[in-house]
Amino acid sequence: NPAKRLARALDGRLVFLYAGAGPLAAVALRWRQQLHENAKLLAHSAVVPELDHNEIVGWERPGALHRGIAVVVLYDPEDAPEIRTRLVLTGEYARRQGAAVHEWEAPAGPRLARLASAVQFGDYLSLYLALLAGADPTPIPSIDEFKRRLAGRRGTPA
């Protein structure tokens, strides 16, 4: 089970999701949100080429922090060659800086089918991570608490 294997590799780490600026940019955002809500796990997502102009500089600072990060590079069969090259080089750079780097390739096929498969994979990934952490993926107590506190402020709708 590929989603379960990836979940085991990501368990206990801060997860960075990197994708091209095409269709998988939305998938990376979806995966991030599912990891937050279901697995109760901090995650971050960014897309190339923009991340290679800014975020990559954040990897320069040496230290133990990078060893607690797992990068998942998401590839799409329709990625332009220059985008794929950027993703490969960015993953290699993160690995040299101490992060664990994993790759995920969307299956070939029509775009809608690829996106549906990618979303499904991320949903399963988030559920497996929740199970590994012993977390119930359904309740969202921090959001509920935030809404209660927000509603307690005069004139602020929840």
Role assignments for model-derived ranges:
Residues 1-158:
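A SIS-like phosphosugar-recognition module
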